[in-house]
């Protein structure tokens, strides 16, 4: 086989042997050797190949597949195609999600020469946001070079999985290919076996002393082990658990549902606010009450992180430990504190439900509660956009243990639908909850590609014609309404039904709660969009009523 075919074949074969199960491809000429090698492996049943036209959507599709625990690679041709992966790479970097990026390039001698579709810095494009980066020269002698290629991939995958370096994350291999780019027959170049890389092993837990009135706080954590550790600590210690929806810990007897309303409602000197210690897992970013809690001078902050980095945006961490456990029986003060939080959590959840049920129309918070309940009932996965939708889930949904994914690494709304498609293709029936701006931002993810499998994904669009989250922030009252609408809220007036029709996607627009419940509770089958039209000017008053109801319930 010719050198480019040999290189591509060795790369794909080695990735499969290292555990690759999904490869996402955006076609191009320079990357054709990788495309042919991937297609051949897919035909042999060794991997699942996903083809997408838009590289940005391809990147987030790969991210969604990777969030389901799979080893995933994404392949693009050279030039701006590679740059379109950058948002997904940044999210994978900040969230700690393993992802293998393979970008095709021209041979080294053509870089900097003005050759078409050649970026001088393509090999360094993602630095410093990748765990490992390598620039692979165009092959000259495949039989001699093949062992080096296999070794390089073993190293790259080890870094992607977090077996070396600062925890899991994306890696980038920029691969040179010279003509001919079309396949030719021949044997795979021989070489030694793969390098088996072992991680450092489970860290020894640090014992936390009994006595302080303690809350366990679980932020976003793509690794299920992080959420499981937070929940296990809270349950074994008997401490209240404040868990964000995408933490993997939001369930069990210690989980408190509308915790952020409780933090906002209570006095720091009162029985609920008298916190002495917070044990933090993951990356908490959803609410200002949590941020204020973590910034309190009178609260000891213990961060649990085995990676080389940890969350401490308030610069208050007293200790960072790789793992934590508690020994001995709780003190009387701990038990009383936990019991108060448990009672307050139940009262607050009932107050939220009553406030939502008192309304007759559709709303984001109501939809969030019902979508989570539907996922809990049929075991489907939930994907939530990183803006208002995830906050509505955090506010109104009961802690039912639903597997929830959200791109909270950098908290962008781009690529949300493609991420959900990846999750659904890897895990099965999935619901996606997002706003209209997040939906429109990733409309290309709906584009049908002949021969590609459509996921079992119900996309629930809460359409308030603009950025509803900004109604809850200071921007809504900082300037005149016309300026706010134009440069902050950005209403669009898009006909979502017409957009779905253009992409050949089923669409419904229920008008009542009964109609909406029927659509939301139907088990996801195929790709369909459920549009819930709501009023943006009611967002802030509704949240104020819910907060007032919680304050009254726990007073």
Swiss-Prot record:
Write the record's keywords in alphabetical order, separated by commas: Magnesium, Manganese, Menaquinone biosynthesis, Metal-binding, Thiamine pyrophosphate, Transferase
Which coenzymes or cofactors are required? Mg(2+); Mn(2+); thiamine diphosphate
A single Pfam family it belongs to is TPP_enzyme_N
Q: In which pathway does it act?
A: Quinol/quinone metabolism; 1,4-dihydroxy-2-naphthoate biosynthesis; 1,4-dihydroxy-2-naphthoate from chorismate: step 2/7; Quinol/quinone metabolism; menaquinone biosynthesis
Report the HAMAP family cross-referenced here. MenD
The family this protein is said to belong to: Belongs to the TPP enzyme family. MenD subfamily.
Q: What is this protein called?
A: 2-succinyl-5-enolpyruvyl-6-hydroxy-3-cyclohexene-1-carboxylate synthase
């Amino acid at each position: 086989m010719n050198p480019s075919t040999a290189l591509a074949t060795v790369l794909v074969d080695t990735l499969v042997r290292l555990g690759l199960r999904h490869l996402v491809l955006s076609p191009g000429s320079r990357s054709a050797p990788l495309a042919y090698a991937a297609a051949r492996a897919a035909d042999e049943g060794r991997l699942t190949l996903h083809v997408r036209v838009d590289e940005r959507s391809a990147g987030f599709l790969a991210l969604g597949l990777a969030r389901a625990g799979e080893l995933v690679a994404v392949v693009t041709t050279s030039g701006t195609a590679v740059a379109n992966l950058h948002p997904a790479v940044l999210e994978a970097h900040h969230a700690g999600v393993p992802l293998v990026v393979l970008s095709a390039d021209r041979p080294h001698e053509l870089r900097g020469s003005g050759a078409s579709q050649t970026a001088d810095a393509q090999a360094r494009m993602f630095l410093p946001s990748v765990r490992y980066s390598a620039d692979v020269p165009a092959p000259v002698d495949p039989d001699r070079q093949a062992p080096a290629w296999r070794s390089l991939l073993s190293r790259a995958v080890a870094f992607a999985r977090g077996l070396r370096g600062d925890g899991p994350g994306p890696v980038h291999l920029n691969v040179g290919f010279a003509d001919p780019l079309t396949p030719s027959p021949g044997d795979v170049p021989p070489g030694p076996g793969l390098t088996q890389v072992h991680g450092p092993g489970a860290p020894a837990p640090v014992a936390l002393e009994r006595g302080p009135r303690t809350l366990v706080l679980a932020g976003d954590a793509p690794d299920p082990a992080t959420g499981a550790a937070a929940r296990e600590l809270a349950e074994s210690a008997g401490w209240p658990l404040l868990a964000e929806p995408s933490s993997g810990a939001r369930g069990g007897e210690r989980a408190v549902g509308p915790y952020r309303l409780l933090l906002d409602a209570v006095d720091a000197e009162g029985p609920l606010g008298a916190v002495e210690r917070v044990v933090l897992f993951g990356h908490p970013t959803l609410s200002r009450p949590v941020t204020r809690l973590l910034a309190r001078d009178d609260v000891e902050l213990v961060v649990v992180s085995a990676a080389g980095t940890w969350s401490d945006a308030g610069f208050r961490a007293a200790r960072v430990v790789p793992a934590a456990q508690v020994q001995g029986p709780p003190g009387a003060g701990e038990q009383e504190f936990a019991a108060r939080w448990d009672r307050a959590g139940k009262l607050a959840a009932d107050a939220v439900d009553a406030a939502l049920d008192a309304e007759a129309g559709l709303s984001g918070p109501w939809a969030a509660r019902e979508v989570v309940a539907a996922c809990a009932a049929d075991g489907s996965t939930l994907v939530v956009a990183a803006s208002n939708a995830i906050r509505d889930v955090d506010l109104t949904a009961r802690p039912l243990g639903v597997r929830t994914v959200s791109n909270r690494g950098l908290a962008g709304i781009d690529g949300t639908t493609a991420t959900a498609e990846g999750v659904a293709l890897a895990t099965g029936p999935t619901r996606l909850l997002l706003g209209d701006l997040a939906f429109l931002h990733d409309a290309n993810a709906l584009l049908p590609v002949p021969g590609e499998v459509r996921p079992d994904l119900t996309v629930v669009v809460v359409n308030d014609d603009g950025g509803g989250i900004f109604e809850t922030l200071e921007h809504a009252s900082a300037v005149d309404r016309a300026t706010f609408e134009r440069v902050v809220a950005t209403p669009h007036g898009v006909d979502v039904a017409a957009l779905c029709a253009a992409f050949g996607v089923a669409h419904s627009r229920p008008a009542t709660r009964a109609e909406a419940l029927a659509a939301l509770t139907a088990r996801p089958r195929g790709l369909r969009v459920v549009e819930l039209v709501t009023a943006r000017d009611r967002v802030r008053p509704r949240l104020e009523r819910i907060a007032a109801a919680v304050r009254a319930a726990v007073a």
